[in-house]
Amino acid sequence: MKLPESFYETIFLFLESGLILGSLGVILLTNIVYSALFLGFVFVCISLLYLLLNADFVAAAQILIYVGAVNVLIIFAVMLINKKQYSNFFVYWTIGDGITLTLCTSIFLLLNNFISNTSWSKIFLMTKPNLVVKDIILINTVRHIGSELLTEFLLPFELMSIILLVALIGAITLARREKKIELEKNDFFNF
């Protein structure tokens, strides 16, 4: 269905503002459960951006993997840990916070510079010089993504699964450790 470009620009504007507000909610809220819910909102906005770009498979994978698995895992881990919340909204900045802010800002600006100065269309056409633009559009994207994941990007794909497994084991370990400490304190006071 062909819609006017202003319609796409309006939806894009709403999605980008949702991304910015959701990201600010993740960073600024002191309640970790609310931050995790805002993170899920950010993931949904990203998947809607993929739908806007006609990347249906990537949008579905974004919803299933990030919202359905990673964000739910984060919420369950946070609820199992059950840490006390900070009552003060404004926490004091330390030197480490300033160093982290400087480092993250410089990495963001460096990546922004590289991304904006790279001609992406030339890179894709240089890697596949015998493809015509009509042939590029007709490539089955799901099959292409699957073959690239299992051939060219097999090692990063497996490393990502190992990182997610370590995060899951770490969340379970933290939840069990908190429970053991509570039980030991209760046993101590019973004597």
UniProtKB/Swiss-Prot annotation:
It is found in: Plastid, Chloroplast thylakoid membrane. The keyword Nucleotide-binding does not apply. GO terms for cellular component: chloroplast thylakoid membrane. GO terms for molecular function: NADH dehydrogenase (ubiquinone) activity; quinone binding. It catalyses: a plastoquinone + NADH + (n+1) H(+)(in) = a plastoquinol + NAD(+) + n H(+)(out); a plastoquinone + NADPH + (n+1) H(+)(in) = a plastoquinol + NADP(+) + n H(+)(out). Gene3D superfamilies: NADH-ubiquinone/plastoquinone oxidoreductase chain 6, subunit NuoJ. InterPro entries: NAD(P)H-Q_Oxidoreduct_6, NADH_UbQ/plastoQ_OxRdtase_su6, Nuo/plastoQ_OxRdtase_6_NuoJ. Its EC number is 7.1.1.-. Pfam families: Oxidored_q3. Keywords: Chloroplast, Membrane, NAD, NADP, Plastid, Plastoquinone, Quinone, Thylakoid, Translocase, Transmembrane, Transmembrane helix, Transport. It is a multi-pass membrane protein. The chain crosses the membrane at residues 10-30, 32-52, 61-81, 89-109, 153-173. NDH shuttles electrons from NAD(P)H:plastoquinone, via FMN and iron-sulfur (Fe-S) centers, to quinones in the photosynthetic chain and possibly in a chloroplast respiratory chain. The immediate electron acceptor for the enzyme in this species is believed to be plastoquinone. Couples the redox reaction to proton translocation, and thus conserves the redox energy in a proton gradient. NCBIfam families: PRK06638.1-3. NDH is composed of at least 16 different subunits, 5 of which are encoded in the nucleus. Belongs to the complex I subunit 6 family. This is NAD(P)H-quinone oxidoreductase subunit 6, chloroplastic. It comes from Marchantia polymorpha (Common liverwort).
